[in-house]
């Protein structure tokens, strides 16, 4: 996304200092060890998980992350549950891999929460993965805790991999969680 505010000065300063320190060459395809360590630390502190830096993979953006996560697990003929509306890469990537995107609706009249009756009716023996974008792009809707808990139950019961796009998780307002 493209926020309507400038990059914070401390980020610009850190980039400038990094360039001046000679950090201009290729790094590990997994991301720098220091960055991976900080990401693991942040996830552990904010999401009550226990990741090691070795479990973190840094990509150049959501496009690469989408492709890598889907290419690693999908096979031709698999189905992927994808919210509608959604960023189009979640439709194009599985299609390019020979998998079939199957959409589930996020409707304004339902406060952009998942209609679980509809979702469960779309799960077949070919369903391998579900995509969750929270907060939603493009609606801005945020799933309630109840929605996320029920979604977790469905994913576990049906042995579905979950691709969770949380790129906008720190851009929530008005007391939303």
Q: Which role fits each region the language model picked out?
A:
Residues 6, 66, 90-91, 139-140:
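Glycine/Thr-rich phosphate-binding loops of Rossmann-like dinucleotide-binding domains
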Residues 95-102:
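A short helix-loop-beta submotif of the ANL/AMP-binding
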Residues 2-3, 63, 134-138:
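Short glycine-rich anion-binding loops that position phosphate/pyrophosphate groups of nucleotides
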């Amino acid at each position: 996304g493209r926020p309507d505010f400038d990059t914070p000065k401390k980020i610009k300063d850190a980039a400038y200092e990094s360039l001046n320190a000679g950090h201009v060459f290729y790094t590990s395809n997994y991301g720098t060890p220091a960055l991976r360590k900080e990401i693991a630390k942040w996830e552990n502190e904010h999401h009550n998980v226990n990741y090691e830096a070795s479990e973190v993979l840094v990509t150049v953006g959501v496009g690469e992350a989408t492709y890598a996560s889907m290419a690693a697990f999908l096979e031709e003929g698999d189905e992927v549950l994808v919210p509608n509306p959604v960023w189009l890469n979640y439709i194009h990537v599985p299609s390019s891999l020979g998998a079939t995107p199957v959409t589930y609706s996020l409707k304004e009249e339902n406060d952009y929460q998942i209609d679980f009756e509809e979702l469960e009716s779309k799960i077949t023996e070919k369903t391998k993965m579900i995509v969750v974008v929270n907060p939603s792009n493009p609606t801005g809707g945020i799933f309630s805790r109840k929605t996320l808990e029920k979604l977790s139950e469905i994913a576990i019961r049906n042995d579905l991999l979950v691709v969770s796009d949380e790129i906008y998780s720190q851009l929530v307002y008005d007391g939303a969680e």
